[in-house]
Regions:
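Bacterial Sec-dependent N-terminal signal peptides
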Residues: 1-23, 440
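Short, acidic Ser/Thr/Gly-rich low-complexity loop/linker segments typical of extracellular
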Residues: 367-372, 378-398, 419, 488
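Short beta-strand edge segments in extracellular beta-sheet folds
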Residues: 418-425, 432-434, 522-526
Length: 526
């Protein structure tokens, strides 16, 4: 089922970085380069004594490092594996589980590494290769305790293998999602599995209450491609979805109804570089953004994500498959790990800075009607703009104490306002635009435009007063998309035919010849 879209704008309002800076609110504590080629996946482990460890997918194996209080790193073990540019890791209990696309004899499958003897040693416990030879990604349920790991993109099925690791020395496959196309990555919350169907450009949502019998709830299509990875907020009301292709934005969805996700926001730090992997911890999301490094978003309001920190790990040009591959922000100390392709493991600290947000509405100063498609420009980013939705709404956020906004709409005088902001809170504002007065374009009283019946089955009749030449009308969907339009209205009676228009709520908007909103009224088809 396709998703629905609410008003969305690129996250251009999040920040205005200085060109010379490569970090904001993120401090580098430690770094480790295995020196054997490209690095990739990373994960964390905490021993019974509270010591913290980082695990890094290196070119020739898995590096295991103890993290000191200040972020200093000491290698405690290195578990060899088939050479590969891609090595992914997760940890369940006292064991790490590692997959790679590297080949070897015997077939590598999934390595199981016993971490319980750290810091003295770590050892390969077993290799599970009865269900697959190689795998691209391995995941677990990050926010719940489950005895399962999930392996995606395998050479045998290209699907998702559900492996019971309650006995780490004897893993057992207990489920398989094999849709007949390639699943690149997945994310698990409770009994729900989200699967990235890379080449299909869809996200599959499954009920895995019975791991042996995954049930497809929804196959969500959207205007992206190369569906790559995703993560959910702690309350599981929102999901952040990334595409592995330069030039594509990442998207935030309201998933309170899994059968009909609603897109509520988008994000990119730089369209030239793809958004690779998201990791959510509390009110923050930590994103690996390839050549743009680590990016931190404040998602206190997931529908208005605001960038509040970053650390650039790549000195070259933006774009392509370089820079930061993975991150892991789940250590009790709050330290953040990252696997950078060129030079290995990074350890960071983020200072938990939050943004201030604004929630605005643009209205007609005379009629009070919301103004659709008004253009809102942030002074710090004059080349980019946000457009109001069918409610005249717009929103944004910033680390600054105040932002200056300019609001414009044809048929109205433009207006510039300064909005004071406070970290961690939201400010509501109303911007009233004054119509450019002419003898024939004053707003209409709502009672002079009558629509009936509504709700309607097949058609709605609109009774209109005498209108100036050049008056136009449009029927908008609740997503702000045009459904029908009428040009040069010269009649007092207009019929809105339903035709193939789906049942639902719509908005009838009447415009003056200069683009001023004369009236806005709801239309409902049953």
């Amino acid at each position: 089922m396709p998703y629905r879209t609410l008003f969305v704008a690129l996250l251009w309002w999040a920040f205005a970085p200085l060109p010379a800076q490569n970090t904001l609110n993120v401090d580098l504590l430690g770094q480790y380069n295995p020196g054997d080629g490209r690095a990739s996946g990373s994960w964390s482990y905490v021993g019974a004594d509270g010591r913290e460890y980082a695990l890094l997918g290196a070119q020739t194996g898995t590096a295991i490092l103890e993290i000191g209080t200040g972020g200093d790193l000491a290698e405690r073990a290195f578990i060899p594996g088939p050479p590969s540019n891609w090595r992914e890791i997760t940890v369940v209990g006292d064991h790490a589980y590692v997959v790679t696309e590297g080949s070897g004899s015997p077939h590598p499958g999934m390595q199981v590494i016993d971490l319980s003897n750290l810091p003295q040693s770590a050892a390969l416990s077993t290799t599970f290769n009865t269900a697959f030879n190689r795998g691209h990604i391995i995941q677990k349920a990050i926010f719940e305790d489950q005895p399962y790991v999930y392996v995606c993109g395998t050479t045998t099925t290209s699907g998702v293998h559900i492996i019971d690791v309650s006995d780490p020395a004897n893993p057992q496959q207990v489920g398989l999602y094999q849709p007949g196309y390639y699943i690149h990555d997945c994310h698990v919350r409770g009994n729900i599995l989200f699967a990235a169907a890379f080449y299909e450009g869809t996200m599959d949502i499954l009920d895995i209450s019975d791991p042996a019998n995954p049930v497809l709830l929804n196959r969500m299509s959207y205007p992206g491609g190369n569906t790559h990875s995703m993560s959910t907020t702690l309350d599981m009301d929102y999901l952040f979805l990334c595409d592995e292709q330069d030039g594509l934005i990442a998207r935030m969805y309201d998933i309170t109804d899994l059968t009909e996700p609603v897109q509520v926001a988008t994000y990119t730090a730089n369209l030239q570089s793809l958004v690779h992997n998201p990791y959510i911890r509390g009110d923050f999301m930590f994103i690996t953004h390839n050549t743009e490094g680590l990016r931190v978003l404040d998602i206190t309001d997931p529908a208005v994500p605001v960038e509040v920190g970053y650390f650039d790990t790549y000195a070259g040009q933006s774009g392509g498959f370089s820079g930061l591959w993975s991150a892991c922000p789940y250590l009790p100390s709050g330290k953040i790990l990252g696997g950078n392709r060129e030079d290995g493991l990074y350890v960071w600290a983020f200072n938990n800075t939050k943004a201030g947000r604004y929630y605005g509405q643009v209205i007609d100063s005379l009629s009070g009607a919301p103004i659709v498609n008004a253009v809102v420009t942030l002074a710090d980013n004059p080349g980019l703009a946000q457009t109001t939705d069918f409610d005249g709404a717009f929103n944004g956020g910033s680390l600054s104490d105040a932002v200056t906004l300019t609001v414009e709409r044809s048929g109205y005088e433009s207006k510039t306002v300064e909005v004071s902001l406070q970290s961690g809170t939201g400010t509501n504002i109303t911007v009233a635009l004054r119509p450019i007065a002419t003898a024939t374009t004053m707003p209409l009283e709502d009672q002079t435009v009558l629509l009936y019946p509504t709700p309607a089955q097949q058609s709605v009749q609109v009774n209109l007063p005498d209108l100036p030449k050049g008056t136009t009308a449009i029927l908008l969907s609740m997503e702000g998309q045009p459904v029908q339009s009428w040009q040069e209205l010269n009649t007092n009676l207009l019929l809105i035919e339903r035709g193939h228009t789906p049942a639902g709520k719509y908005l009838f908007v009447l415009y003056s010849p200069t683009g001023q909103v004369l009236t806005t009224q709801p239309v409902v088809f049953q």
